[in-house]
């Protein structure tokens, strides 16, 4: 073993790493926004907060991954949307606190650098950033032979946003009588996939199940997570929203109570929830108890808003999409979420 080839012989391809950087530059360039300083490849990404025009800025950050949905991306060899999932999981969390996303960083760890595949992953991250209005200002690609299988990789992201101090959404404004509005999800989004994979373990992904309205199973399972930023930001700017819940792991039961005080509860009319076909299929083929579905999945509502009754029509007008009045805030007696 010569010194020149020592790293390569240990399984790390430095040249492939350089190629990845060159391939992703054009995708990163798509995400440019006011405030970005410096060029890709520095030791740290820089952002000029004064360019946001926010008078009393509060930075709000979030980090997340996409769980075992990655395993389906690997199984079906489709890597161009999983990055959007990663961005969505982060920015939807910080928008729930009232933040406008400013910038994003990603982390990809793999056992073997495959430049074409990793370019697809980062292209998806960039697309998510464009949808969220966030700049992709840095990241890390780690080649770790022995830590992962040769075809495996993991993906995580980190989002930072800004809110006017007076417009932070922390649940303190939610009161009894507020209306709960549901914004539709694009599908399963990025949680519950350990169960999803078990339910469909014996399927190839090419199947067109009768519940899925003509779509292949793999298309539905890898449908990228919806990014709600551009829909919700105008509502925050007009201070029309009292609370926001991003419905992720733990479904309605765990996430909805995060947007209001402990003495309140959410009363939800199940008949008003726009349940998507994939959830009906999961319940049927997985033989999952109906009530448990609401403890795991978004059931068709990826983001829930608590809105004062007098603001409901204005919110609907600004959203300009199907909005579902699915419940209201009540005084808590026993449970924090009542599904009727």
UniProtKB/Swiss-Prot annotation:
Annotated GO biological process: 'de novo' IMP biosynthetic process; adenine biosynthetic process
Catalytic activity: 2-formamido-N(1)-(5-O-phospho-beta-D-ribosyl)acetamidine + ATP = 5-amino-1-(5-phospho-beta-D-ribosyl)imidazole + ADP + phosphate + H(+)
Enzyme Commission number(s): 6.3.3.1
Record pathway: Purine metabolism; IMP biosynthesis via de novo pathway; 5-amino-1-(5-phospho-D-ribosyl)imidazole from N(2)-formyl-N(1)-(5-phospho-D-ribosyl)glycinamide: step 2/2
Protein location: Cytoplasm
GO cellular component terms listed in the entry, alphabetical order: cytosol
UniProt keyword annotations, A-Z: ATP-binding, Cytoplasm, Ligase, Nucleotide-binding, Purine biosynthesis
Family per record: Belongs to the AIR synthase family.
Keyword Transport: no
Annotated gene: purM
GO molecular function, one term: ATP binding
Pfam families according to UniProt: AIRS (PF00586), AIRS_C (PF02769)
InterPro entries: PurM-like_C_dom (IPR010918), PurM-like_C_sf (IPR036676), PurM-like_N (IPR016188), PurM-like_N_sf (IPR036921), PurM_cligase (IPR004733)
Protein name: Phosphoribosylformylglycinamidine cyclo-ligase
